[in-house]
A protein has these predicted regions:
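Bacterial N-terminal signal peptides
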Residues: 6-16
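Positively charged n-region of N-terminal signal peptides that target proteins for export
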Residues: 1-4
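Electron-transfer interface patches adjacent to heme c in soluble/periplasmic c-type cytochromes
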Residues: 22-46, 56-133, 143-144, 169-269
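Short, charged low-complexity linear segments at domain edges
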Residues: 36-52, 144-164
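Hydrophobic, well-structured mid-protein blocks that either form specific transmembrane helices
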Residues: 134-141, 150-151
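Sec/Tat signal peptide C-region and signal peptidase I cleavage site
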Residues: 17-21
Length: 269
């Protein structure tokens, strides 16, 4: 666990300075330096530890652990599993990302209702999310593994095509699509660099750096959360957790990151 708590205090202390920093190349450099400084003691480790405990603990009406959950590489295999997700699962006859697969395992193995399994998908500062902890634990087991999301099954190809369509679909009060904010290099909103997600390098870096511990929120955030929040920025209706649309969009982004080593849980401002 190293000095996570001390690092957390440091991060909080650094935050106001960051908010006041002027936009410009200097800011980007500062944020990068600050990321580097925190990289050896990411508070995400606290979520990982809690997630490991949740994975192993007997829970739900059936009082069994998740250790027999098949994330795609065989029952209980966690190492490298995230680097090949989303993918098609024959037992559910659909494409699933990590979260929808975990919900599936909570329902089938542990006997939870869907409502219980999807309760509080994202933490809110005072109440932590079990789902985000599980995601932190499992994704950490793919650190360094090269992304290799499959397009073998017809439903995997369908999900990719649907995700691509959603990415370029314009609508809402501002007539925005994801591409409006994410298809040009060098764009920035306030202090934040906007990755060009249609360009391989940016797409790889963006996808492989989630989940991330968000210093500004004191929370670990998953890719499902990232997409939920970008739907909000786009003034679209709320993206339903583990919905077909969220999985398809994840498939599009994850597949476009193929070839890059997975590098999360990361740390972000
Ligand atoms: C109104 C502009 C806007 C729209 C539209 C938008 N985003 Fe974003 N997106 C952002 C901003 C701003 C950030 C950076 C947020 C931050 O750093 O806090 C971001 C970050 C991201 C990231 C993480 C990048 C990284 O390197 O960490 C991903 C992935 C992403 N958006 C995907 C999407 C997808 C998919 C859509 C369409 C559903 C979308 N965005 C729509 C503004 C937008």
């Amino acid at each position: 666990m190293r000095n996570s708590v001390a690092v957390l205090a440091l991060a909080v202390a650094l935050c106001p300075g960051l908010a006041q920093a002027q936009a410009g190349d200097n800011t980007v450099k500062k944020i990068e330096e600050y990321r580097q400084a925190l990289v050896d003691g990411n508070p995400a480790e606290l979520w990982e530890a809690r997630g490991e405990d949740l994975w192993k603990r007997k829970r739900g009406p059936k009082q069994v652990s998740l250790e027999a959950c098949d994330l795609g590489l065989g029952a209980g295999v966690i190492k490298g599993a995230y680097a090949v997700l989303p993918r098609y699962f024959a037992d559910a006859d659909r494409v699933m990302d990590l979260e929808s697969r975990l919900v599936h395992c909570m329902m089938t193995l542990q006997g939870m209702s869907r409502a219980d399994a999807t309760r509080r998908p994202f933490g809110n500062g005072t109440e932590r999310s079990d789902m985000e902890a599980l995601v932190a634990f499992i994704t950490a087991e793919s650190k360094g593994v090269v992304m290799n999301v499959p397009q073998r099954h017809a439903k995997e190809r369908e999900a990719y095509a649907l995700g691509k369509q959603i990415f370029f679909f314009r609508g809402g009060p501002h007539d925005f699509s994801c591409a409006t904010c994410h298809s040009e290099g060098g764009k920035r909103i306030r202090l934040q660099d906007l990755p060009n997600l249609t360009e391989t390098k940016d797409a790889q870096r963006a996808y492989t750096s989630w989940p991330a511990y968000r210093v500004s929120q004191g929370e670990l955030r998953s890719m499902q959360w990232r997409l939920f929040d970008c739907f909000r920025q786009q003034r679209f209706p709320a993206l339903e957790f583990t919905s077909e649309a969220s999985v398809a969009l994840t498939m599009f982004l994850a597949r476009n990151a193929n070839g890059a080593p997975f590098a999360a849980p990361a740390i972000k401002r």
